[in-house]
Structure formats: C-alpha cells, structure tokens
C-alpha cells in the first residue's frame, strides 16, 4: 500500500513513530545533560521571554510542581533567574540568563549540524519533500498548541 492510500490512523501511527525516533535520536547525539522537561522549559523561556511558572505549565502542558522543580534545577545551574514583579510582589518571573541562551544556542547548533549532515546525503527532491512535511507538521500541531 502506498502512502497515498493510507488511512489517517495509519499515517498518525507512522508519523508518531517517525517523529518519536527522530526526537530520541537527536537527544542521543546531544551531549547535553538536560532532561527533556527541563530543556523544554529552558527553550520556552528563551523563546517567549520571561514567564511565570503558571505560564510555563500551560504552554508546555506540564504540572506546576514539575515546572517548579525544573526551574529550581535551571536556576541552580545558572541558566535561568527568578525576578520579582515590579508591581505585584507575589508574581515571580522566570527569565533566561546569558548562560542559558548560550546553552540553547549550542544545543540547537549540535542538533542542526547532525541533521544537516544527514539531509545533505538525500536527493534534493527528498529534502524539499521533508521541508513541506515540516510545514505540514507545524500546521498540524499549531491547531492545539495555542496558549
């Protein structure tokens, strides 16, 4: 059966499997010791700017206690800092530090380099197909990924 004739459930299973393998492979080839949850939080704060723990929990779909524990690890490592809100002392903002930004940049560079090497071995038409597929995946997850 060709991919043109696969039912949505079959495509969903194949896509889930392939993207999961890609994510695991990228983690395996990365020497970073951050857990997936901690890395996700660091990337969110780096991407979105200062966030509260509640903001992070909603955006990353994590339990607030998990966010609190991960932020503590990131703060201890000097990758994020906590800042009190100027107008409401009860609110604590979590912001990325320069060391956190460097960590994100290095992680992205390593993973991009690994993937680029593999993409360069493919036929240009396959690279274009993967580019279009990535756009489709972005649209697919974007439907549910709104904060």
Where on the chain are the PLM-derived regions?
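N-terminal helix-turn-helix DNA-binding core of bacterial DNA-binding proteins
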Residues: 25-66, 73, 77, 93
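Short, structured helix-loop boundary elements
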Residues: 8-12, 16, 35, 64, ...
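N-terminal leader segment of winged-helix/HTH proteins
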Residues: 1-36
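Helical hydrophobic small-molecule/effector-binding pocket
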Residues: 29-32, 101-106, 139
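Amphipathic alpha-helical dimerization/coiled-coil segments
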Residues: 3, 10, 22, 26, ...
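Charged, amphipathic alpha-helical coiled-coil/dimerization segments
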Residues: 72-132
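Short, locally clustered residues in the helix-turn-helix/winged-helix DNA-binding domain
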Residues: 43-47, 108, 135
